[in-house]
Amino acid sequence: MSQQHTLPVTLSPALSQELLKTVPPPVNTQQEQMKQPTPLPPPCQKVPVELPVEVPSKQEEKHMTAVKGLPEQECEQQQQEPQEQELQQQHWEQHEEHQKAENPEQQLKQEKAQRDQQLNEQLEEEKKLLDQRLDQELVKRDEQLGMKKEQLLELPEQQEQHLKHLEQQEGQLELPEQQEGQLKHLEQQEGQLKHLEQQEGQLEVPEEQVGQLKYLEQQEGQLKHLDQQEGQLKHLDQQEGQLKHLDQQEGQLKHLDQQEGQLKHLDQQEGQLELPEQQEGQLKHLEQQEGQLKHLEHEEGQLEVPEEQVGQLKYLEQQEGQLKHLDQQEGQLELPEQQEGQLKHLEQQEGQLKHLEHQKGQLEVPEEQVGQLKYLEQQEGQLKHLDQQEGQLELPEQQEGQLKHLEQQEGQLKHLEHQEGQLEVPEEQVGQLKYLEQQEGQLKHLDQQEGQLKHLDQQEKQLELPEQQVGQLKHLEQQEGQLEVPEEQVGQLKYLEQQEGQLKHLDQQEGQLELPEQQEGQLKHLEQQEGQLKHLEHQEGQLEVPEEQVGQLKYLEQQEGQLKHLDQQEGQLKHLDQQEKQLELPEQQVGQLKHLEQQEGQLEHLEGQEGQLEHLEHQEGQLGLPEQQVWQLKQLEKQEGQPKNLEEEEGQLKHLVQQEGQLEQQEGQVEHLEEQVGQLKHLEEQEGQLKYLEQQQGQLEVPEQQVGQPKHLEQEEKQLELPEQQEGQLKHLEKQEAQLELPEQQVGQPKHLEQQEKQLEHPEQKDGQLKHLEQQEGQLKNLEQQKGQLEQPVFAPAPGQVQDIQPALPTKGEVLLPVEQQQQKQEVQWPPKHK
């Protein structure tokens, strides 16, 4: 090597160009490099030089000795060529090391592909040989059977019954007692024949004995034939042993099928847990199985019995399928399609958890219970994962059907999502639909958690859980004991039950929107899934885990313990986030508190307007509306329900008091009456809701024992509607602000309030409305009590408001059609329709 570097290198330009053309560029793969040997100039073509992966020193010495006899120019070319080869080799080694560092998985895949090709070729050759052997042996058997039939036809009539009996014995592979007696009788006859042959030599055979001798000769032929049959019976016994061996191999095949199910489960776990240590252990296990396959192939070549080989061929074909399945699984180690769906599902769950955390920050939930609930939810999810894994280890066949069913369900869900995207939902209903879909998902999740809590006690008795899980179960029992709702939350439960009625009302509205049929199908689909989960849990209690799977279960349990530890840490982080959110009131609550304060001021203002309403009732039907008052009506119509601008309204009211004797003042008061009509409509809507809530309160008697974790989860679930109501109130206030700032645009408001203005002249409906307002007064008191119990107050007017507003009802001669229509709609909507 040192001599080659010290020699001078002088090349003509033509030779250097030729050498540059002959030098191939570095190739990415080893196979292409081996296919392209370096061509040499014409004088040096006798010396074959190919680029191996590693060039040993002996070849270089031989190469140097072969070059000595050539002229100087040729030697210089040959000296230049090994230097170039060394440079190429160094470059190739660096490239190979870089490829090894970058692509270890590609090398493994290539090696496994080569192994699979070799195994497939060997298996095909062995199949051909076995087929040839089977054909030859079948031909031999056919020939033997033909010979047997010919021999059986040649036998005398006396032996026909005996031969039929022997054929039956061949089918049964057992020697009956009658045949054994006949064999003994024939052996005795053989002894007699030998004795008679001795006597033949000594005595002259008389004529009587000649017939006996012929008979004995016939019996000798029969004895030989019986000996042949005995050999055939022994051969049949051997075949019977081979059949037993085949039965044992069938048992092994069943065992391998079970192992296939376990391998599939392990591959799923490989996709789910991106842990390199698990993958290494599983790869070692796969290599062991490949070694077992080679051992079985070696045994296959040694077996001579055709029937055994047939079973082994089937076994090897199954193992080929296993190898292909394992290769597919190795390719799927990087996030398979199932993982992507699971990740999407987890992202959706994270969004729901964030939404729940935001709502928990708004509500006064005890801090201890928040962390416990999250911990329980995490543990319940882990228990579900354990149940699925156990069901997968014990029920591989059922899993295949369930996987097909789940794929069908995924297709149905995609189809439903596609249909949802095609339907045009109004903008106002879009937010409600999204919110209701989230609530439905949360309700289903909570129902699943309730079923899992009931099933926990059964699982404690049936499953042999490791020590980590035993401690976790004890911790769960302690948490269940701690999750008794305090007395302060009992009032919240009642309030949430009332909100449950509002949720049902929203469900009705959702049914009236454009997607009722899809949601019903989804609900039925989820109910079917719940039934399947219950069925799997029931099967899990009945099945006993085999001994081979115990080790796998322990391994999985260790992994689950690690996952639980990570989930606990995540739960602690989420708990800290919740505490931070609880320390600061969210912006929505601040706006709601201001809104409620403004509403309280508005109620006091309404009580002050009671006297004015009494005076206006007499003057409404008598006075016509001049043009100036029409403009004031339109201007004041847009000021109804504006709690932020109460000071402006007070100034307007003072102006109206000064103009009591004038028509303009009366028109302004009429407009104010229209404002109160809108408030009455709002109160009527609340009244319908309160009636429905009172019915539900009578129906839902919450026992003290059940006021546990499920009720607490229902609280969170039912309080999900509050932010949406608050958003609606904020939008309403923003609209009112915009209306106050733009009085010129108020002229073009809808004519609905003008119609109400004309319809206020009919007092015939006063009596029903008075009763309705009296009922409403009691419901408003109940709302005030609930407002004191919760930090999120409810719209609660003063108790004397309704009685004060009663004189402000319309006079005779007018009809309140919109109010009646709204009442009829509310009566139709409550109670909810059960489809």
Curated annotation (Swiss-Prot):
GO process annotations (BP): keratinization; keratinocyte differentiation; peptide cross-linking; response to UV-B
Found, by tissue, as follows: Keratinocytes of epidermis and other stratified squamous epithelia.
Q: Where in the cell is it found?
A: Cytoplasm
Give yes or no: UniProt keyword Cell membrane.
no
Return the annotated region ranges for Disordered: 1-133, 150-206, 221-285, 321-342, 381-428, 446-486, 501-548, 566-809
Any one cellular component term from GO for this entry? cytoplasm
**UniProt biased composition (Low complexity):** 76-91, 169-181, 269-281, 329-341, 389-401, 509-521, 655-668, 693-710
Modification after translation:
Substrate of transglutaminase. Specific glutamines or lysines are cross-linked to keratins, desmoplakin and to inter involucrin molecules.
Q: Which domain of life is it from?
A: Eukaryota
User: Does the record bear Cytoplasm in its keywords?
Assistant: yes
Task: Give a short account of what the protein does.
Answer: Part of the insoluble cornified cell envelope (CE) of stratified squamous epithelia.
Q: How does it assemble?
A: Directly or indirectly cross-linked to cornifelin (CNFN).
The record's family statement is: Belongs to the involucrin family.
Q: Can you say what this protein is called?
A: Involucrin
Species per Swiss-Prot/TrEMBL record: Pongo pygmaeus (Bornean orangutan)
